[in-house]
């Protein structure tokens, strides 16, 4: 291989509106203590009515492109992961975001892998770069999850937040600046554990079908058990495959779904506190955006430096899951 795929830059963006746990007490039977005890979440950000996922994503994308010392014209491919797209079926959020960046006549498409979306993005970008098909790939996790939440459902609406993270994936000849490994998987037999019902209206030919509200639905207890079991196995597999141990990893950056899930994985693998990046307490679960947001925050705080090895892992609707070992190419 002449070159490897490399994570050249990272940036994140969140909306300005903070929503604290206590604010849910206005319309739900809940409390700040109840939410934080079960999830570790203290607050989250919600976009305003005019903002869409692409609006959040484009801010992070512009900064990521700038940090990579590139211009939008240098981008060969745009891929977006989201469960809250700007439009129901088309156009893709990637196409909308490309237009806002001024990128024309370049391929753009979305990935639907829910909270595992960013790991899937890394897999796609790595393949395109290392095959020689693209030199610079922009990947974006962008979510306005507040647009798909049922605010009468205490089991879901308290968990999620809005935000975006973006990366530029380019080339390097150095292994220790590369996306070392990515593994992704799915099992559709559990698709009813996490889903958003279809919103297409019945036609005169199938009037018996009922149009459902497009709200996120989740079997919380079942998802929790499967997530912990699956993530532990997946992380152990990728470390063993690459002859690495937890102490070889500079930062462990898991999907920020629930503090208890993160803690279970951290304790089992014996990661030290300084290795673990946590943002769930202030942003909640931002689905496909959570890992790049956490990476972006670690970078801005000076915790993530060039050459650092990151272990990423995620689990989401599909069910989907995946993990990655990534050196920060800087």
From Swiss-Prot:
The entry's localization annotation reads: Cytoplasm
Question: Region ACP-binding: start and end of each range?
Answer: 256-260
Pathways per UniProt: Lipid metabolism; fatty acid biosynthesis
Q: Which residues form the active site?
A: 115, 255, 285
Question: Mostly located where?
Answer: cytoplasm
**UniProt GO BP:** fatty acid biosynthetic process; secondary metabolite biosynthetic process
GO terms (molecular function) for this protein are:
3-oxoacyl-[acyl-carrier-protein] synthase activity; beta-ketoacyl-acyl-carrier-protein synthase III activity
One GO CC term, this protein: cytoplasm
- InterPro entries per the UniProt record, alphabetical: ACP_syn_III_C, ACP_syn_III_N, FabH, Thiolase-like
The EC designation for this entry is: 2.3.1.180
Catalysed reactions listed for this entry: malonyl-[ACP] + acetyl-CoA + H(+) = 3-oxobutanoyl-[ACP] + CO2 + CoA
What are the UniProt keywords, alphabetically?
Acyltransferase, Cytoplasm, Fatty acid biosynthesis, Fatty acid metabolism, Lipid biosynthesis, Lipid metabolism, Multifunctional enzyme, Transferase
What family classification does the UniProt entry report for this protein?
Belongs to the thiolase-like superfamily. FabH family.
Q: Which HAMAP family match?
A: FabH
Fill in the domain comment. The last Arg residue of the ACP-binding site is essential for the weak association between ACP/AcpP and FabH.
* Function comment: Catalyzes the condensation reaction of fatty acid synthesis by the addition to an acyl acceptor of two carbons from malonyl-ACP. Catalyzes the first condensation reaction which initiates fatty acid synthesis and may therefore play a role in governing the total rate of fatty acid production. Possesses both acetoacetyl-ACP synthase and acetyl transacylase activities. Its substrate specificity determines the biosynthesis of branched-chain and/or straight-chain of fatty acids.
What is its quaternary makeup?
Answer: Homodimer.
Protein name in the entry: Beta-ketoacyl-[acyl-carrier-protein] synthase III
Annotated organism of origin: Helicobacter pylori (strain P12)
- Gene behind this chain? fabH
């Amino acid at each position: 291989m002449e070159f490897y795929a490399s994570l050249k830059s990272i940036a994140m963006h969140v909306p300005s509106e903070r929503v604290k746990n206590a604010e849910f007490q206005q319309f739900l039977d809940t409390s700040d203590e109840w939410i934080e005890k079960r999830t570790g979440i203290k607050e989250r950000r919600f976009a305003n009515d005019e903002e869409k996922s692409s609006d959040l994503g484009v801010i992070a994308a512009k900064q990521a492109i700038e940090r990579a010392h590139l211009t939008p014209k240098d981008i060969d491919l745009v891929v977006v992961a989201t469960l809250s797209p700007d439009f129901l079926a088309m156009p893709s959020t990637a196409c909308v975001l490309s237009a806002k960046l001024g990128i024309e006549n370049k391929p753009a498409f979305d990935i639907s892998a829910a909270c595992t979306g960013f790991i899937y993005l890394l897999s796609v970008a790595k393949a395109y770069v290392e095959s020689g098909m693209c030199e610079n790939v922009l990947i974006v996790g962008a979510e306005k999850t507040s647009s798909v939440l049922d605010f009468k459902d205490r089991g879901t609406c308290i968990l999620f937040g809005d935000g975006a993270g973006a990366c530029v994936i380019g080339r390097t000849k150095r292994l220790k600046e590369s996306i070392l490994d990515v593994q992704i998987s799915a099992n559709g037999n559990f698709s009813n554990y996490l889903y958003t019902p279809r919103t297409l209206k019945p036609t005169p030919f199938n009037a018996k079908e009922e149009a459902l509200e497009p709200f996120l639905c989740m079997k919380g207890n079942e998802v929790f058990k499967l997530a912990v079991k699956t993530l532990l196995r997946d992380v152990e597999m990728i470390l063993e495959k690459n002859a690495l141990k937890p102490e070889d990893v500079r930062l462990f950056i898991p999907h920020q779904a629930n503090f208890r899930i993160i803690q279970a994985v951290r304790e089992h693998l014996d990661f030290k506190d300084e290795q673990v990046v946590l943002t769930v307490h202030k942003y909640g679960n931002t689905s496909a955006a959570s890992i790049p947001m956490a990476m972006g925050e670690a970078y801005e705080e000076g915790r993530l430096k060039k050459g650092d090895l990151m272990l990423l892992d995620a689990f989401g609707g599909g069910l989907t899951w995946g993990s990655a070992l990534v050196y920060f190419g800087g």
